[in-house]
């Protein structure tokens, strides 16, 4: 038996993982989320939130540092959301690196970042943290929706929604904390490995978490924060985005009998206009809950042509009140309108409507 000796420094220093809650606009310092400890966050001096619609106890956060996510429980009455999906009073969702937590009413955006800390007994903690530029926040990794699939079928890779091996997951977590998320989308748009199509006006990338066999995003190179910023000056661009979406369908799914829709989410999860091009099979393990389904199968999903007509007639896009409530509607088949009690039963039902 061989004897293995450890250096004094190796013995005296222990690496631990810690989690931080980071306000995207840097209005206040980061909030530490100790491993498995419940932390209440809301209106108050710590967050500098004074909005009375935000409760002093708006959310309860519990970091799973070893697993790389934070459990978020909505405690306040007004809606807290993750990537524009409302959690619901006394309900809980997982917040992962790259996702955006809006504290209340789609306001006050936060992200999480994980760090490795080297602790020496009796000495000051040493942090080991990757940075990009001067940013202290995490990159949103081209948003939750931007990283390309790499499956056997173009536009589809259901396996990427399953739990990856731990080493890969840790590597992905570190990658997601390289820079501020608002830079991430631009980085992905310009990454040749992520691009399906590009021209001088737009680029098409695969959705990171496709909700169907085929799911792409068409994004303009021009910086347009959201549909609210769209004017008549953007009409030709909107038309071009629609045309490119149809081209991608023809190029990559031309032999498929699947039906497609092109449209925008009424309340998008990224601060850059993006057109969803999605097949209507909804055959993907990434489609996990009612909010996922309703975001594509209610009026929450704005048809591309309807948006173009709205801008042409009114000069802007108007989103009616109450859109978040649509995400709570019962599950209803988009083909035959039958009500289904659960996502697994809905998915089984949808198989009946797939092209033979």
Curated annotation (Swiss-Prot):
- Gene Ontology CC: one annotated term: nucleus
Positions of the UniProt region annotated as Interaction with DNA substrate: 207-211, 269-270
Site positions (Interaction with DNA substrate): 188, 265, 276, 291
Ranges where the HIT domain occurs: 182-287
Q: List the disulfide bonds.
A: none
User: What Gene3D superfamilies does this protein's entry cite?
Assistant: 2.60.200.20, HIT-like
Q: Which reaction does it catalyse?
A: a 5'-end adenosine-5'-diphospho-5'-2'-deoxyribonucleoside-DNA + H2O = a 5'-end 5'-phospho-2'-deoxyribonucleoside-DNA + AMP + 2 H(+); a 5'-end adenosine-5'-diphospho-5'-ribonucleoside-2'-deoxyribonucleotide-DNA + H2O = a 5'-end 5'-phospho-ribonucleoside-2'-deoxyribonucleotide-DNA + AMP + 2 H(+); a 3'-end 2'-deoxyribonucleotide-3'-diphospho-5'-guanosine-DNA + H2O = a 3'-end 2'-deoxyribonucleotide 3'-phosphate-DNA + GMP + 2 H(+)
Per the record, which residues fall in region Interactions with ADPRT/PARP1 and NCL? 1-110
Q: Mind listing the GO biological process terms from this record?
A: single strand break repair
Q: Using the UniProt annotation, give all residue ranges assigned to the region (Disordered).
A: 120-179
Motif Nuclear localization signal boundaries: 126-131
Name the principal localization, coarsely classed: nucleus
Alphabetized Pfam families for the sequence: DcpS_C (PF11969), FHA_2 (PF17913), zf-C2HE (PF16278)
Determine the domain of life of the protein's source: Eukaryota
Basic and acidic residues compositional bias: what residue ranges? 165-178
Q: Where is the FHA-like domain?
A: 38-87
Q: Which InterPro entries match?
A: FHA_2, FHA_APTX, Histidine_triad_CS, HIT-like, HIT-like_sf, SMAD_FHA_dom_sf, Znf-C2HE, Znf_C2H2_type
Q: What is its EC number?
A: 3.6.1.71, 3.6.1.72
Annotated GO molecular function terms are:
DNA 5'-adenosine monophosphate hydrolase activity; DNA-3'-diphospho-5'-guanosine diphosphatase; double-stranded RNA binding; mismatched DNA binding; single-strand break-containing DNA binding; single-stranded DNA binding; zinc ion binding
Q: Which UniProt keywords apply?
A: DNA damage, DNA repair, DNA-binding, Hydrolase, Metal-binding, Nucleus, Phosphoprotein, Zinc, Zinc-finger
Q: Which residues form the active site?
A: 274
Outline the subunit composition.
Answer: Interacts with single-strand break repair proteins XRCC1, XRCC4, ADPRT/PARP1 and p53/TP53. Interacts with NCL. Interacts (via FHA-like domain) with MDC1 (phosphorylated).
Q: What does this protein do?
A: DNA-binding protein involved in single-strand DNA break repair, double-strand DNA break repair and base excision repair. Resolves abortive DNA ligation intermediates formed either at base excision sites, or when DNA ligases attempt to repair non-ligatable breaks induced by reactive oxygen species. Catalyzes the release of adenylate groups covalently linked to 5'-phosphate termini, resulting in the production of 5'-phosphate termini that can be efficiently rejoined.
Comment block on domains: The histidine triad, also called HIT motif, forms part of the binding loop for the alpha-phosphate of purine mononucleotide.
Q: What is this protein called?
A: Aprataxin
Organism of origin: Sus scrofa
Its lineage reads: Eukaryota, Metazoa, Chordata, Craniata, Vertebrata
């Amino acid at each position: 038996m061989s004897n293995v000796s450890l250096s004094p420094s190796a013995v005296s220093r222990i690496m631990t993982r810690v989690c931080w809650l980071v306000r995207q606009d840097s209005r206040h310092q980061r909030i530490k989320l100790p491993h498995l400890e419940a932390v209440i966050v809301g209106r108050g001096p710590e967050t500098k939130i004074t909005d009375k619609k935000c409760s002093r106890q708006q959310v309860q956060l519990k970091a799973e540092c070893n697993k790389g996510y934070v459990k978020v429980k909505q405690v306040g009455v007004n809606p807290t959301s993750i990537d524009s999906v409302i959690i619901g009073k006394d309900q809980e969702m997982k917040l992962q690196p790259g996702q955006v937590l809006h504290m209340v009413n789609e306001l006050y955006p936060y992200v999480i970042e994980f760090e490795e800390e080297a602790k020496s007994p009796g000495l000051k903690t040493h942090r080991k943290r990757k940075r990009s530029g001067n940013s202290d926040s995490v990159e949103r990794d081209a948003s939750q929706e931007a990283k390309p699939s790499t499956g056997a079928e173009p536009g589809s890779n259901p396996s990427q929604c399953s739990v990856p091996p731990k080493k890969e997951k840790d590597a992905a977590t570190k990658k997601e904390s390289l820079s501020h998320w608002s830079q991430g989308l631009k980085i992905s748009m310009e990454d040749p490995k992520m691009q399906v199509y590009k021209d001088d006006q737009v680029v098409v990338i695969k959705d990171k978490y496709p909700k169907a066999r085929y799911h792409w995003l068409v994004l303009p190179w021009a910086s347009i924060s959201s549909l609210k910023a769209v004017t008549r000056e953007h009409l030709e661009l909107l038309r071009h985005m629609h045309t490119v979406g149809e081209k991608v369908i023809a190029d990559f799914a031309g032999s498929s009998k699947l039906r497609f829709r092109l449209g925008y989410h009424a309340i998008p999860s990224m601060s850059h206009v993006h057109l969803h091009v999605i097949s209507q099979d909804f055959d993907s393990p990434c489609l996990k809950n009612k909010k996922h389904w309703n975001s594509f199968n209610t009026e929450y999903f704005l048809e591309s042509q309807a948006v173009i007509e709205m801008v042409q007639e009114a000069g802007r896009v108007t989103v009616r009140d109450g859109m978040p409530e649509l995400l709570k509607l019962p599950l209803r088949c988009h083909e035959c309108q039958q009500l289904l009690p659960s996502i697994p039963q809905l998915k089984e039902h949808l198989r009946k409507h797939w092209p033979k």
